[in-house]
C-alpha cells in the first residue's frame, strides 16, 4: 500500500498506522497521545477509503470533509492525505503566569483574532523555538478576552517548567478541539460535572458558561485530588455556590476536612450518589483516564445515555516525558 502526502509517496507496512508511517519518514506530523484522544494528528483524506475507527470522536462536519486521526488510521488500500485547517497555528502571547497551588499554574494568553471556541474545549500549545507541543483545556469562557489554562507542574515537565518563566513569550495555538462543552439543550436538565486534578479546568469553564446562560436546573460540581491543596479552586467554587442556589459542590481527598462538603468518599461514589436524576442529566467527566472510563461506564449502566456523557480524559505523552 502507498501513502501520498505533500508530494511524496511512502510505502505503508502491513498493519502500520498512517502516523507511524509518516513518523518513520520524518513527515513532520504532530502527535501526542497516539490513542485518538488529543486530536493532534488530524489529517484530511483526498483519496482512499477511511476506516471508521479513524474518524471516531470527530465532529460530523469534520468526518464529512474526510478528516481523520492518523494514529488510528490503518488503511486497507492506497490513500492520498493532506493537512487540514484544524492544525493551522494561531499566534499568541503569554501575558500572565501565576500559581493556583504548589502544583498548578494559571497561564493566561492573548486571544488571537477570530479564535472562536466553546468553554470546555482544548487547544494544542506549541513552543515555536523547538516545536514542543502539549494539549491543555481552556478554563476560560468564550466571553472572556484572554484564554486561561491550568497547567499541572511536573518535575521533569518540559512545557510546564518552561511556562513558569514564560510571561511575555510568543507561543502558537492549534485548535480548538473537543466536544466537552456546555450544551444549552434545556434549562431544566440537571448538570453533573466531575473531574480530577487539572481536569477541573474545562469543568470550571463549562460551569461558568452554564451559570452565565441562566441555567436554572440543579448543578453539581465534584473535584477529586490527592490532597486538600489539590482542590486548588475550592474557594472560588465555594463563592459561586453562595451566589447561585442551584449549585452544589463536593470534594474528594484521602482524609478528613473541616468542610463537610469534602470527604474521603471516592469521586465515583459521590457522582453516583449525587442526588440528581442521572438518566435525565447531562454529565461532564474530565481528568484521569481510568477515572473517566470507569465512571462513564457506571453512569451509562445507571441509565445516562452515552450522548449526554461528555468525557475528556487527560493523557500523558506517548513514549516520552512531558
Identify the role of each PLM range.
Residues 190-194, 284:
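Conserved beta-strand elements of the Class I
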Residues 1-79, 222-322:
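Reductase modules of NAD(P)H-dependent flavoproteins
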Residues 202-212:
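Histidine-anchored nucleotide/phosphate-binding helix
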Residues 3, 81-84, 123-128, 169-175:
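Short conserved beta-strand and strand-loop elements enriched in small hydrophobics
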Residues 89-169, 225-226, 253-255:
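Ferredoxin-reductase
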Residues 120, 199, 288:
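Short, conserved phosphate/pyrophosphate- and ester-handling motifs at nucleotide-, phospho-/glycolipid
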Residues 1-3, 9, 68-73, 82-110:
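Short N-terminal strand-loop motif that marks the start
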Residues 176-186:
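A short, basic/flexible loop-to-alpha-helix module at the beginning of a structural domain
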Amino acid at each position: 500500500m502507498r501513502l501520498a502526502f505533500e508530494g511524496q509517496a511512502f510505502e505503508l507496512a502491513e498493519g502500520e498506522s498512517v502516523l507511524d508511517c509518516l513518523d518513520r519518514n520524518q513527515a513532520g506530523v504532530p502527535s501526542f497521545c497516539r490513542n485518538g484522544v488529543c486530536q493532534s494528528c488530524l489529517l484530511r483524506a483526498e483519496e482512499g477509503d477511511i476506516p471508521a475507527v479513524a474518524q471516531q470522536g470527530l465532529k460530523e462536519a469534520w468526518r464529512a470533509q474526510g478528516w481523520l486521526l492518523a494514529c488510528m488510521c490503518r488503511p486497507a488500500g492506497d490513500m492520498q492525505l493532506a493537512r487540514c485547517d484544524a492544525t493551522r497555528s494561531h499566534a499568541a502571547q503569554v501575558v500572565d503566569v501565576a500559581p493556583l497551588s504548589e502544583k498548578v499554574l494559571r497561564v493566561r494568553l492573548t486571544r488571537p483574532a477570530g479564535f472562536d471556541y466553546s468553554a470546555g474545549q482544548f487547544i494544542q500549545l506549541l513552543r515555536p523555538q523547538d516545536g514542543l507541543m502539549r494539549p491543555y483545556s481552556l478554563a476560560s469562557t468564550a466571553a472572556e478576552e484572554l484564554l486561561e489554562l491550568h497547567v499541572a507542574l511536573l518535575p521533569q515537565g518540559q512545557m510546564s517548567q518552561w511556562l513558569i518563566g514564560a510571561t511575555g513569550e510568543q507561543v502558537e495555538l492549534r485548535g480548538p478541539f473537543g466536544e466537552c462543552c456546555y450544551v444549552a439543550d434545556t434549562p431544566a436538565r440537571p448538570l453533573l460535572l466531575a473531574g480530577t486534578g487539572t481536569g477541573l479546568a474545562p469543568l470550571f469553564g463549562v460551569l461558568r458558561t452554564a451559570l452565565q446562560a441562566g441555567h436554572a436546573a440543579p448543578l453539581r460540581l465534584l473535584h477529586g485530588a490527592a490532597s486538600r491543596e489539590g482542590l486548588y479552586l475550592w474557594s472560588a467554587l465555594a463563592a459561586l455556590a453562595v451566589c447561585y442556589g442551584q449549585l452544589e459542590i463536593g470534594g474528594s481527598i484521602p482524609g478528613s476536612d473541616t468542610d463537610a462538603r469534602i470527604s474521603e468518599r471516592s469521586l465515583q461514589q459521590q457522582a453516583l450518589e449525587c442526588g440528581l436524576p442521572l438518566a435525565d442529566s447531562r454529565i461532564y467527566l474530565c481528568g484521569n483516564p481510568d477515572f473517566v472510563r470507569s465512571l462513564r461506564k457506571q453512569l451509562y449502566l445507571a441509565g445516562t445515555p452515552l450522548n449526554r456523557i461528555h468525557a475528556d480524559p487527560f493523557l500523558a505523552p506517548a513514549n516520552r516525558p512531558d
